[in-house]
A protein has these predicted regions:
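Conserved positions within tandem-repeat grammars
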Residues: 683-684, 689, 693, 707, ...
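Non-catalytic terminal extensions of PLP-dependent enzymes
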Residues: 1-81, 90, 98, 243-273, ...
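Short acidic-aromatic active-site loops that bind/stabilize oxyanions
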Residues: 78-89, 105-109, 195, 199, ...
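General small-molecule cofactor/ligand-binding pocket signal
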Residues: 106, 152-154, 462
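Short amphipathic alpha-helical segments embedded in low-complexity Lys/Glu-rich regions
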Residues: 111-114, 160-161, 193-194, 468-470, ...
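Intrinsically disordered, low-complexity tandem-repeat regions
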Residues: 682, 698, 702, 711, ...
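Short loop-beta-helix segment that forms the pyridoxal 5′-phosphate
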Residues: 97-119
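Conserved PLP-enzyme active-site core in the AAT-like
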Residues: 115-125, 129-380
Length: 730
């Protein structure tokens, strides 16, 4: 027994020592202690331009000398190059890959905005189709523009009562993929990008999303923006819904001989009847293990939720085809977006942050969750606070249809219920996010944030909506900081209570009107109105919604193509039947996502939303001029260049059939069997061997009511004489 204890002791020490290693930080620290002569760049190196100054010595007093002793541009002498790492920096990235469960990890010193652009440029070529959450960070939109992608925007479910979006339902994703398949464009679909978790804490079932998408498009690449989710790897419940853990689990399942056997048995049991799209959308699909490729990327803002200096981020890769297909393009994209003068302090902090979570991450994240739950309890159980504000529950932010577990408050009903919800529900809520509904205070979210929390008490938050503010606990949150926040909220509520009691009748009426607007009136969030036909792709057997953002973006570089119109002027032109097309991104804060992108047509819903939003910060909108839009002449010019008629359609290429050449109706008609279009074979329509031609669905889990579907139901049996009918409904 003593021998066993000794082996255990030595194993633990070995594991701790391996995790404690910080190759780049240690190399930088050692380098900083060497005497050097700088005959190159960086006068600030070792603080020499500061300590010898008459006027800026206080910089050393504030920051300390060590940070300047470690400031260097050297890439040798024990250090390394971020662009071509071969030494300690390479080792640090390998250790990060082990800690985060990836096959490759890369450090980024300009935030996840740059990380997203690197991954997008590495994977997407001009003309590739990308499925993108419209409610994503602006870096994705700009990345699509730089890559020349044709973007299909995915709609998240709206939360109109709180003027925010949730997440993109799996049904929405599948419907877009199936539409692209029908149009014969599935071979051009390259990537899908989603945000997990969302800013407001809504978490996807990552493995299921990838599983069902790969059943339709077996080589689809996934980019998961985990800017706010880096910490999730280090908690056993959270981890199951991270990109890297889900990629590994899916890969192992696809390689499991039992899975392959069950898949083959299910194929043999399929019928030849082809299911409708509605059937496919309602059923759980699984991929063919012989064809599916697990290709997953995650970008994380380490500095947002873990220990790192600002702008410290990471790219994690789990891609079966990385070495064959992506390594070289990724290197070029990394070179294109990475500075040749990276900040070594940021890189060292990423190394140290990895050490911390590798050794104590589980403890820190558990404490983070506990602090969040204490904050929820303190707010909701305080009689005065609950009068003016409340923490939104899972049932407030995730509609019932996405919660098969039917647990309305899994965060408060015990660990077993929380795990059940995380195992079954399409979306779950991150316990460390607290969305505080403040409508009864009469304050809108932005005013509450600035005038009350930040200006008066120094409470820092970021995300607000029309009637809510978001609090997030992190691994640095302490119990005393939670207690201070509760005290601040109580002070605000107490002052408000007193002010209301002393209001005149007129003031009271004004206050009640403000409360009514914030609590009873909802602000309808507009759907994506669509790209103008001049920027759409018109190939394929039927219309699909993807648009060329890059072409629309660069058209505005010639200012003669643009003009400014006010909302009222746009209304008048819409009344006259004229399409008005945005020349730029229009992004109000809050909510912080582009309401308009280049090439998108204005709608009345968008204009009304912008009028009702009541926010002073709108990027892409100039109050004195209005919206920057394309002139009618510019749109006509682009339309003519791609062969569109004035009404936005391509001229028909069909020749009128001679009157004497009447034919009998084709046997295989449209949806109702009565069409008389000419027959078109499968290979003529979408080409042979299209990805996704062999879809299948697994038998659902025992606790699921989702029916089965397999290959033959999904694409139909290859019966002699079968032909695919062209659809001209669009």
């Amino acid at each position: 027994a003593r021998e066993g204890m000794l082996e255990l002791h030595l194993s633990i020490l070995h594991g701790v020592a391996a995790r404690y290693r910080t190759p780049f930080f240690s190399a930088l620290k050692e380098y900083s202690h060497r005497p050097t002569g700088v005959f190159h760049a960086l006068p600030i190196s070792q603080g020499k331009s500061i300590v010898n100054s008459h006027w800026i010595r206080d910089m050393v007093g504030f920051y300390g000398l060590d940070v300047f002793m470690a400031e260097t541009s050297a890439t040798c002498g024990g250090l390394d190059s971020l662009l071509e790492p071969t030494g300690p920096l390479r080792e640090s990235q390998q250790l990060a890959a082990q800690a985060y469960g990836s096959r490759h990890t890369y450090f980024v010193t300009n935030g996840t905005s740059t990380a997203n652009k690197i991954v997008t440029q590495a994977l997407v070529a001009p003309g590739d189709i990308v499925l993108l959450d419209r409610n994503c960070h602006q870096s994705h939109h700009y990345g699509m523009m730089l890559a020349g992608a044709n973007v299909v925007y995915l709609e998240a479910y709206p939360l109109n009562d709180y003027s925010m979006y949730g997440a993109v339902p799996l049904r929405e994703i599948k419907s877009k993929l199936l539409a692209l398949k029908r149009a014969g464009k599935l071979d051009r679909v390259k990537m899908m990008s989603l945000t997990n978790c969302t800013f407001d804490g809504i978490v996807y079932d990552v493995e299921r999303v990838m599983e069902e998408c790969l059943a339709i498009k077996p080589d689809l690449v996934f980019l998961w923006d985990e800017a706010w989710f880096a910490f999730a790897r280090f908690h056993p419940v959270y981890r199951t819904r991270t990109a890297m853990a889900s990629a590994r689990a899916l890969r192992e399942r696809l390689q499991d001989p039992d899975y392959k056997r069950r898949f083959e048995e299910h194929l043999a049991a399929e019928t030849a009847e082809e299911p409708s799209d509605d059937d496919l959308l309602a059923r759980r699909l699984i991929p063919d293990p012989a064809r599916a490729r697990v290709r997953v990327y995650a970008t994380q803002s380490t500095h947002k939720t873990l220990t790192a200096l600002r702008q410290g981020s990471m790219i994690h890769v789990f891609d079966q085809d990385y070495d064959q297909k992506v390594a070289e393009p990724f290197h070029e994209a990394y070179m294109a977006h990475t500075s040749t003068s990276p900040n070594y302090q940021i890189l060292a902090s990423l190394d140290l942050g990895r050490r911390q979570v590798a050794l104590e991450g589980v403890e820190l994240v558990q404490r983070q969750i506990e602090n969040a739950m204490q904050l929820r309890d303190a707010i909701d159980n305080h009689p005065l606070l609950s009068k003016y504000m409340r923490c939104l529950r899972t049932s407030d932010l995730i509609p019932e249809g996405f919660r098969p577990s039917a647990i309305s408050q899994p965060l408060r009903s015990g660990l077993r219920n929380m795990m059940a919800a995380w195992d079954q529900d399409e979306f779950v809520l991150d316990p460390s996010r607290i969305t505080l509904f403040i409508g009864p205070t009469g304050y809108d979210g932005d005013t509450f944030k600035r005038q009350q929390l930040m200006d008066r008490y120094g409470i820092q938050i970021n995300k607000t909506s029309r009637n809510s503010v978001l609090f997030m606990t992190n691994i640095g949150t302490t119990r005393s900081s939670v207690a201070f926040l509760v005290e601040v909220l109580v002070n605000i509520a107490r002052e408000l209570d007193q002010d209301i009691s002393e209001m005149s009748l007129g003031e009271r009426e004004h206050f009640e009107q403000a409360v009514y607007r914030l609590t009873e009136m909802s602000l309808v969030l507009p759907d994506f109105s669509g790209f103008h036909p001049a920027f759409r792709d018109h190939s394929g057997s039927e219309a699909t919604p993807e648009g060329d953002v890059r072409r629309a973006f660069y058209l505005s570089y010639d200012d003669t193509n643009c003009q400014y119109l006010t909302g009222e002027q746009i209304d008048e032109r819409l009344d006259a039947g004229v399409d008005i097309v945005s020349a730029t991104y229009v992004t109000p804060y809050p909510p912080g996502f582009p309401v308009l992108v280049p090439g998108q047509v204005f709608s009345r819903e968008i204009l009304q939303f912008m009028r009702d939003l009541d926010t002073p910060e709108i990027h892409g909108y100039r109050p004195n001029f209005g919206y920057r839009v394309y002139t009618e002449k510019a749109i006509e010019m682009v339309s003519e260049s791609i062969g569109l008629t004035p009404n936005g359609h391509r001229p028909s290429r069909r020749k009128a059939a001679p009157k004497t050449a009447k034919k009998k109706p084709a046997k295989h008609g449209g949806a109702n069997g009565e069409g008389n279009l000419p027959e078109v074979g499968h290979d003529e329509l979408i080409g042979p061997n299209q990805p996704g031609d062999a879809l299948a669905a697994a038998p659902p889990p025992a606790d699921s009511a989702v029916p089965e579907v397999g290959v033959e139901e999904l694409i139909g049996g290859q019966q002699p004489g079968d032909a695919v009918q062209a659809d001209n409904s669009s």
